[in-house]
Amino acid sequence: MIHFLLCFNRQSKVRLSKFYSTYTPTEKNRATREVMNQVLSRSPKFCNFVQWREFTIVYQRFASLFFVMVTDSTDNELVTLESIQRFVVVLDIVFGNICELDLIYEFQRAYQVLDEFLLTGHLQESSSKEILRAINDAEGMEKSLLVAEVLDQHFL
């Protein structure tokens, strides 16, 4: 099970975070800080897996961003690493070459992709095509609702 996902830059600025286990706000802040310190203190030559408490930290760096999943220590690290890779590929397609600014200014879309990808800490959909199809359907529905709202306002 994935307990939480973080995305942050080298300056320890969190750009995306989602917790799938119950934590108090204080525990979330502490866990986030500890995980960021663990990841940022490691050399790029080291393995992308770190034991932390009773969990395993699995991370991957893409440009200036670190994508981190904290999982049970019994989970397969390579599958988790592949999940991170898939998530970033889908973000790359949705945003057209993902960058940190996309996560800052269009964080709703990033969370939408994440919600299509993971559900309650488990991989919901592994197919990039299905994730993209669901996102396109949701955006199409959102646009049609917006058009209907505008029509209602102007023609009532």
From Swiss-Prot:
One of its GO terms (cellular component) is AP-1 adaptor complex. Gene3D superfamilies: 3.30.450.60. Its main location: Golgi. Pfam families: Clat_adaptor_s. GO terms for biological process: protein transport; vesicle-mediated transport. Disulfide bonds: none annotated. GO terms for molecular function: clathrin adaptor activity. The keyword tRNA-binding does not apply. Keywords: Cytoplasmic vesicle, Golgi apparatus, Membrane, Protein transport, Transport. It is found in: Golgi apparatus, trans-Golgi network; Cytoplasmic vesicle, Clathrin-coated vesicle membrane. Subunit of clathrin-associated adaptor protein complex 1 that plays a role in protein sorting in the trans-Golgi network (TGN) and endosomes. The AP complexes mediate the recruitment of clathrin to membranes and the recognition of sorting signals within the cytosolic tails of transmembrane cargo molecules. Also involved in early steps of phagocytosis and macropinocytosis. Adaptor protein complex 1 (AP-1) is a heterotetramer composed of two large adaptins (gamma-type subunit and beta-type subunit), a medium adaptin (mu-type subunit) and a small adaptin (sigma-type subunit). Belongs to the adaptor complexes small subunit family. This is AP-1 complex subunit sigma-1. The lineage of its organism: Eukaryota, Amoebozoa, Evosea, Eumycetozoa, Dictyostelia.
